[in-house]
Amino acid sequence: MDRDQKKKELEQTKNEMRRKLEEYKERNRIMASKTTPTATTTSTLNTASTPSPPVAQEDFNSIMNSIDSMVPTQATPSSSSTISTSTHAESQKSNYIRPTLTIQSLVIEHDFPPKEIPMYSKGTQTMTDADTSNTNNTPELEAPNKNKTKYQLLQQQQQQQQQQQSSLNQDMQNLSIGTDSINGDGSSTSVANSANIDDDDKDEIEIPELDENEKKDILESDSFKSFFGRSSRVIERALCLDDSIDILVDYTISDENSKGTSKELKLLATLSDERWTKHRSITDISWSTKHPELVVSSYSANEAGSHDPDGVALVWSVNNYFQKPEYVFTCQSPVMTTFFSKFHSTLIVGGTYSGQIVIWDTRAEAKPVQKTPLSSVGHTHPVYSMAVVGSANANSLVSISTDAKLCSWNLENLSQPIETIELNSSNTNSANKAGGGGSGGGAPNMSIAVTSLVFPENELNHFYIGTEEGVICQAGRHGNRIVMNERYKGHFGPITSVDLHPSKGGADFSQYFLSSSTDWTCKLWSSKKETPLYSFEDYVDYVYDARWSPVHPSIFSTGDGSGTLSLWDLNQDLEAPIFRHKISNRSVNRLAWSHDGKRILVGDSGGSLSLFDSSEFSSPTSEEYSQFEDVMTKMVNKSRTSDSPLLGEGENQE
């Protein structure tokens, strides 16, 4: 009976376990259909290493409780019931049906989609119109898809500004309400009572009343009378004149600085360096022929004293004029002239006050890579002017100095000059021509102190020189002698610059040239006439430089000791410049036009380079060339009949 009872209980337990397992499986299927699977879970009934879901944990506990409540598979012998014989035990063991319970690991399978691999392309980075319409429903700011992020930021900024403005208005309103709520006895009313005040009834700012004496003083003041007179005239014009007439025209504006033209030079920037240009004067300016944005400028010694070298040459980029110099070159003597080599774009040539000629290389350090010896072989006086002549395959450097020497150099070897010619009356076959005037005057062996040198285009032997005596000479090299072909007399002070006309645009104006001097004048010359064609005398100080525009036939610029830049147009006016600009209180030492004529650099004695935009004067018309040709023809004809051939006063008196 006991055994049958145990069998029944075991069968009931097995059925109960099957039923609970079926319920457990059904419950898991329902949960799998309702939730999204995230990971594969394997639960083992006899292993507790992996945590199970909460619902599954409850089922496992119930199963384990059922197993614990089961009858043990093998009865434990008791002290009260002891089997006496082994045969009886073996028969009982053989007849005993041992129940078995197999529990397998419960495996839950989940299906996960494959991981999406991002592909970066224009399609994935650009939203469609449909996406934009779904994500951006705000009508205040509709932006292109490409700039969606930018416009969203702008939208956020607008919203923040609106919130700040609204909060500020609210604070101001609360402040005004709080102020109005204070009574005269110092007690304050509630904000609720003051909120009923209408906005139109807010207190206005009180304007102080003036007494009769104050009103009388204002009405009789000069400033009020001037203001009232101008205002009344404007009102009368508005009431009486036609609408097409400018009623605000000002008849007090002077046109002295822009006479005859509405064009002007525009200041772009000022190039200077605290260390290298302060207390130094600019001695020369030159634009690069290869890199149109580069310019080199030379400087004198530091007047305030410095541990830096006396000679400085700086290379600037006008495209980066807010930056420091591109290159800084130094030498032991002040640099009086400098320029980029015409056929070697990386070489910069400089002439010094000691007479040395130095060459810097932009590929090397700040010190010169070559220099001439300090001896009588080269120059012993300051070198104020030099030029590179020849072609790309055969060229030489020609230098001239106040020591009356003209030297030719090979740029690859400056140890000694190729040729040296003495400029004195005994070595020039026309020294006594035109007698006197500062170039010897018939005195034997008198040296010619040269301050400027210029070669015509494509010329190797013929050149123009300006002297300290105020005479301009057209000379030529013939062997070891200098032939003075012409002498141009008209200045009463040292020549500071000579500049030949560039002769572009199809017309030949190469015979005309400009000169400036310390006699406060700038003169226009023709190489075919020994006296000036015209003398420009609208100056109050030394004229240090005069330069033709490289593209416009009738325009040139001058700089004087008063710190003024003057722009002249011979087609418009011969008596006054069309534009005049005060650079500084320091003298204007050097000028340099860019090769395209769209910019001009002005250097002063304070060490500053002023960059001007001259593009308005860089596009001449064919009519302006014809007009300039007519002007010069009339000037030449009148100078021939002038009563005073020395100064050309016949033209100046017109």
Curated annotation (Swiss-Prot):
PROSITE patterns: WD_REPEATS_1, WD_REPEATS_2, WD_REPEATS_REGION. Its main location: cytoplasm. Acts as one of several non-catalytic accessory components of the cytoplasmic dynein 1 complex that are thought to be involved in linking dynein to cargos and to adapter proteins that regulate dynein function. Cytoplasmic dynein 1 acts as a motor for the intracellular retrograde motility of vesicles and organelles along microtubules. The intermediate chain mediates the binding of dynein to dynactin. Residues 1-59, 71-95, 116-144, 175-205 are annotated as: Disordered. Residues 122-139, 175-196 have a biased composition (Polar residues). The keyword Transport does not apply. Homodimer. The cytoplasmic dynein 1 complex consists of two catalytic heavy chains (HCs) and a number of non-catalytic subunits presented by intermediate chains (ICs), light intermediate chains (LICs) and light chains (LCs). One of its GO terms (biological process) is minus-end-directed vesicle transport along microtubule. Gene3D superfamilies: YVTN repeat-like/Quinoprotein amine dehydrogenase. Residues 32-50, 76-87 have a biased composition (Low complexity). This is Cytoplasmic dynein 1 intermediate chain. GO terms for cellular component: centrosome; cytoplasmic dynein complex; early phagosome membrane; microtubule; phagolysosome membrane. It is found in: Cytoplasm, Cytoskeleton. It comes from the Eukaryota. It comes from Dictyostelium discoideum (Social amoeba). Signal peptide: none annotated. InterPro entries: DYNC1I1/DYNC1I2, Dynein_IC, WD40/YVTN_repeat-like_dom_sf, WD40_repeat_dom_sf, WD40_rpt.
